[in-house]
Design a protein with these regions (language model features):
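Short, flexible helix-loop junctions that flank or precede catalytic/ligand sites
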Residues: 1-309
Length: 309
C-alpha cells in the first residue's frame, strides 16, 4: 500500500504541473492546489508519516457558491463597501475563512472597477475579471513569500489586497501600512473572537513596539469577522459568526490596552450591525438548526448563553 500511495502522490505532483516534489521530499510537508480542466479544482496537503508519504485532498468548486446558501449574512457582505483600511476574517483551521474571503472578493469584483491583488498559499477559488481586474498570485509559484509579494503589490497599483494569512510581524506591519495608505486590505488569522485577534496581532511585536502598533491598528482596522463551523441537526456544518465593526469606543479600547472590554461592546451593539458569537449560536438554536448542547459547546460564554436557551 505505501508504494501505491507514493505513486499516486507523485502523479498528483505531475497533475499540478509547476509544483516540484523535491522540496516536499526534503521538508516533509506541502500545501498546494491544482485543477483538472472540465472536472474540478483540488486543494492538497501532502506530508510524511511513519517514513512514507500521505495526502489529504479536498475538492474546490470552480464556481463560488451563493453566499446566502453558505449562511453568510448580508451584514458581512456589506463590508465590501469599505474602500480602505483592514478587514480581518478569523477562525480555526477549516472554519471556512477562505470561502468567506473569496465571497467578499467576488462581491467587490462584481460591483466595483478596482484592481484586486490576491496573495494566497495556495490559490483556491479562481476569480474571473468582472467589473474589476483580479490578479491572483500563489506563494512559492508566482512569488517567494507573503512579505515579498505584499511589498511588490504596493507597487502594482492595487485598490484591494487580499493577504491569505499574516504570519509574522513584518508582514503584519506592511499590511497595516498598506491599509494606512489608502488600500483595502483583507486577511485572515487563526483566532476566535475580535478581542483575541487584536491581542494576537499586538503580541506578535516586541513590548517596546506594542503601544505604537496598537495606535496604528486602532486607526486602520475597520472590522473583524470571526467564524466557526458547527454541526447542524441534519448532519451538515453551518457557520456561526461574530462581527465587530470599528467604533470610536473600540478604537479607544485598543489604544488604551483594554481589548478585554471589546466583547461587552459587541454584545450591546446589535444596532450597529455587530453580532456576538453567542447571539449567532442562539439564533441557530432558535431556528432549529443546532441543538442546545452544540450551542453551549461552541459558546464563548456558556453560562450566560444557558440562561437564554
Amino acid at each position: 500500500m505505501p508504494d501505491t500511495t507514493e505513486s499516486l502522490i507523485r502523479q498528483i505532483y505531475v497533475l499540478a504541473q509547476n509544483r516540484k516534489i523535491e522540496p516536499f521530499l526534503e521538508s516533509g510537508d506541502d500545501d498546494f492546489s491544482f485543477a483538472i480542466r472540465g472536472l474540478s479544482r483540488y486543494r492538497v496537503s501532502t506530508y510524511k508519516q511513519r517514513g512514507s508519504l500521505a495526502a489529504v485532498i479536498r475538492v474546490i468548486a470552480f464556481e463560488l457558491p451563493d453566499p446566502a446558501l453558505l449562511g453568510i449574512p448580508d451584514s458581512i457582505l456589506q463590508l465590501t463597501d469599505l474602500t480602505k483600511g483592514m478587514l480581518l476574517v478569523t477562525g480555526p483551521a477549516g472554519s471556512g475563512k477562505s470561502t468567506t474571503l473569496a465571497c467578499l472578493i467576488d462581491r467587490i469584483n462584481s460591483t466595483r472597477e478596482d484592481h484586486i491583488i490576491t496573495l494566497e498559499d495556495p490559490l483556491e477559488f479562481l476569480h474571473r475579471h468582472k467589473k474589476s481586474i483580479v490578479s491572483q498570485r500563489e506563494i512559492a509559484t508566482d512569488t517567494d513569500n507573503y512579505l515579498t509579494a505584499l511589498r511588490a503589490a504596493l507597487r502594482q497599483s492595487p485598490d484591494v489586497i487580499l493577504l491569505g494569512e499574516m504570519r509574522d510581524h513584518e508582514t503584519i506591519q506592511t499590511a497595516m501600512t498598506a491599509a494606512e495608505t489608502g488600500h483595502l486590505v483583507l486577511s485572515s488569522l487563526h483566532t476566535i473572537g475580535a478581542a483575541n485577534t487584536i491581542s494576537r496581532i499586538i503580541d506578535v511585536f516586541e513590548p517596546s513596539q506594542q503601544h505604537q502598533i496598537a495606535m496604528q491598528l486602532s486607526m486602520v482596522l475597520r472590522a473583524v469577522v470571526s467564524q466557526q463551523l458547527v454541526p447542524a441537526i441534519d448532519g451538515h456544518m453551518v457557520p456561526a459568526f461574530e462581527i465587530m465593526i470599528m467604533t470610536p469606543a473600540i478604537s479607544n479600547m485598543i489604544r488604551d490596552n483594554k481589548t478585554h472590554q471589546i466583547d461587552g461592546i459587541i454584545y450591546t451593539s446589535a444596532k450597529d450591525e455587530m453580532r456576538s458569537m453567542d447571539s449567532s449560536l442562539l439564533q441557530l438554536y432558535q431556528s432549529g438548526t443546532i441543538t442546545a448542547e452544540t450551542a453551549l459547546h461552541y459558546s464563548t460564554n456558556p453560562d450566560m448563553l444557558r440562561k437564554k436557551l
